[in-house]
Amino acid sequence: MPNEFTSAKLRSDCSRTSLQWYTQTQHKMRRPSLLLKDILKCMLVVFGVWLLYILKLNYTAEECDMKKLNYVDPARIKRAHRNTQEVFQKECRPGHAKKTMDLLFKGKYSMDLEPFVQKIPTASEAELKYDPPFGFRKFSSKVQSLLDMLPEHDFPEHLRAKHCKRCVVIGNGGILHGLELGHALNQFDVVIRLNSAPIEGYSEHVGNKTTIRMTYPEGAPLSDAEYYANDLFVAVLFKSVDFKWLQAMVKNESLPFWIRLFFWKQVAEKIPLQPKHFRILNPVIIKETAFDILQYSEPQSRFWGHDKNIPTIGIIAIVLATHLCDEVSLAGFGYDLSQPRTPLHYFDSQCMGAMNWQVMHNVTTETQFLQKLIKEGVVQDLSGGIH
């Protein structure tokens, strides 16, 4: 006959068995539930991509008024040339861009920030705080592997040695067409071009000198003709496959087909430059530009959509220029959204209205930022597109 102890033990064992059975049953029930959630997420993503593709195919915006691209007000041409002449008529002011940025954005702009990622034993705390493009959290080993392939990590010595450097950041705006600023733009010490903006066929208006080509994989020119032997290719890294793409470009290797599937458009198969001409943009520049200067919200984990907290390549390039050069000028910047049928770029027929469809950038905030830089004399707007 069982005593109290054995009875309690039997009850305990039975309870434990029941609990184990219940827990195992719950786990089994939860697994299909989690699997179902994952399947639903994948289906939503596929449906979303399909929907965006259909909308893109069926979006019939008004055709651009190409007459506006072909006709340029003579007064605007004169004004652009006068703006450029004024830059070179004055004596270059050493440290002007950094000093004025520091005064304008006190505590938000680091005067001693390295423009490019350096090969050092440990990355800075700021570099590792965020995921790309604002930092290299979880990617430090990949960055170090890339840096091991690059023989140089600084601005070229002949440019660093120059007492006072003048930069021009050339945007891709349709406003450049017809201004015939090419010769004047070639006079700057440092010429920064963005993404795939072509020179061939447009040099009369945009010049043919390039010091820096700043872009991300999908934005890099596909044609070898757009690269010159002494260009610096400054890579902006946004996602994991961007590191693999850059590694392939530096090593002059082909990128596997399956990796290409992760890019939203065709990427260059080769970059005809030597490894010493590649640089990696310091992500802290993007972080400071976005969160400190433009006051965008920090990245949040989201299943769908964007926070509009990523600055355009053009804005990032302007901030980079203030770290590289003593004086900074702009050409080809400015979005006139009140003229949706005006050509957006100097090299294609895409309309200004397309900017209303993009979901990554805050055009209004960026325009206000540029207006502030011009008003305070940090930069000079040569083409007059920023109102």
From Swiss-Prot:
UniProt signal peptide: none
Its membrane topology: Single-pass type II membrane protein
GO cellular component: a single term: Golgi membrane
Extracellular side: 55-387
Glycosylation sites: N58, N208
Membrane topology, Cytoplasmic segments: 1-33
UniProt GO MF annotations: lactosylceramide alpha-2,3-sialyltransferase activity
Catalysed reactions listed for this entry: a beta-D-Gal-(1->4)-beta-D-Glc-(1<->1)-Cer(d18:1(4E)) + CMP-N-acetyl-beta-neuraminate = a ganglioside GM3 (d18:1(4E)) + CMP + H(+); ganglioside GA2 (d18:1(4E)/18:0) + CMP-N-acetyl-beta-neuraminate = ganglioside GM2 (d18:1(4E)/18:0) + CMP + H(+); a beta-D-Gal-(1<->1')-ceramide + CMP-N-acetyl-beta-neuraminate = N-acetyl-alpha-neuraminosyl-(2->3)-beta-D-galactosyl-(1<->1')-ceramide + CMP + H(+); ganglioside GA1 (d18:1(4E)/18:0) + CMP-N-acetyl-beta-neuraminate = ganglioside GM1 (d18:1(4E)/18:0) + CMP + H(+)
InterPro entries (UniProt xref): Glyco_trans_29, Glycosyltransferase_29, GT29-like_sf, Sialyl_trans
Main location: Golgi
Transmembrane segments: 34-54
Disulfide bonds, paired cysteine numbers: C167-C325
A GO BP annotation: protein glycosylation
EC number: 2.4.3.9
Compartment(s) of residence: Golgi apparatus membrane
Keywords of the record: Disulfide bond, Glycoprotein, Glycosyltransferase, Golgi apparatus, Lipid metabolism, Membrane, Signal-anchor, Transferase, Transmembrane, Transmembrane helix
Keyword flag Transmembrane: yes
Chain's role: Transfers the sialyl group (N-acetyl-alpha-neuraminyl or NeuAc) from CMP-NeuAc to the non-reducing terminal galactose (Gal) of glycosphingolipids forming gangliosides (important molecules involved in the regulation of multiple cellular processes, including cell proliferation and differentiation, apoptosis, embryogenesis, development, and oncogenesis).
Homology family: Belongs to the glycosyltransferase 29 family.
Name of the protein described by the UniProt record: Lactosylceramide alpha-2,3-sialyltransferase
Species for this entry: Rattus norvegicus
High-level lineage: Eukaryota, Metazoa, Chordata, Craniata, Vertebrata
